[in-house]
Amino acid sequence: MATSARRAYGFGRADEATHPDSIRATLAEFLSTFVFVFAGEGSILALDKLYWDTAAHTGTNTPGGLVLVALAHALALFAAVSAAINVSGGHVNPAVTFAALIGGRISVIRAIYYWVAQLIGAILACLLLRLATNGLRPVGFHVASGVSELHGLLMEIILTFALVYVVYSTAIDPKRGSIGIIAPLAIGLIVGANILVGGPFDGASMNPARAFGPALVGWRWSNHWIYWVGPFIGGALAALIYEYMIIPSVNEPPHHSTHQPLAPEDY
C-alpha cells in the first residue's frame, strides 16, 4: 500500500482487513519478527551454553558477551528489516508500529495486524528455540540488581526514542532521499549500540515483542511491564517530535526541488 508525505489518521478502509496487501504485509512482519527474535534470544542462550560448558558460569554478564549479543541483534535486525521493508515497511517491533500509528503513517487496522503478527512471531521463535536447545529456558529481560524499575523504564524510553528517531530519519522522512537505502543498516546499528549502553542495566529491549516471547515461553515476568510502557512512550515521543517539529508542513514551500517523495513502504 503506497503512502504519501501527508499524514493520514484513520481506522482504515473497509476492504483493508482482507486486502491481499494487508495479508502479505502481516506475513512479512510475522516472519521477520520470528527471524529477529530467534537470532537475538538464541545468541543469549548460545553464550550461556558456551560459558556453562566451560565452567565459567558467567554467560552474557561479561564485556565480551555483551558485545556479541549486541552484534547478533544488530545483524539479525538488519536482515529482518531488509527482508520486510518493501512489503510491510519492516517494523519488526510493536513500538515502531505504534510510532507509525501515532504519526499518521499507518491505519489502525494495519497496526493491529502487525502487532498480532509480531507477537506470534516472537512466541513461535522462543518455542522453537526451547525445542531446538533441548529445553533451555528463554532468558528474556529484567532490571539488573541495583537498578530500580523507574530507572529501567527511563532507559527503555530513551533507547526506544533513539531507535524510532533513526527509523523516522532514514525510512519515513520524505526528505531522506537516497539515505533510505541504508535504513535497515542504520536501524540495526542503533539497536546494537543501544544494547551496549542499556544491556547491563535492563537488557535494552526497545521492543515489546522481543520481550514478550521469552517472558511467555520462559515464564519470566519480573519487571515485564517496563518493556511495554517504556518503548511505547519512547516511540510515541520520537514520532510526535519528528512529525511535527522536523518534517515540514505540507503547506510549507520547499527550499529546493530535489526532495524525494515517501517511498511506497507501509510506515
From Swiss-Prot:
Belongs to the MIP/aquaporin (TC 1.A.8) family. TIP (TC 1.A.8.10) subfamily. It comes from Arabidopsis thaliana. The modification N-acetylmethionine is found at residue 1. Residues 48-66, 132-151, 200-226 are vacuolar. The gene is TIP3-2. The keyword Acetylation applies. GO terms for cellular component: vacuolar membrane. The modification N-acetylalanine is found at residue 2. This is Probable aquaporin TIP3-2. Residues 2-26, 88-110, 173-178, 248-267 are cytoplasmic. Pfam families: MIP (PF00230). PANTHER family: AQUAPORIN TIP3-2-RELATED, AQUAPORIN-8. A motif (NPA 1) lies at residues 93-95. Keywords: Acetylation, Membrane, Repeat, Transmembrane, Transmembrane helix, Transport, Vacuole.
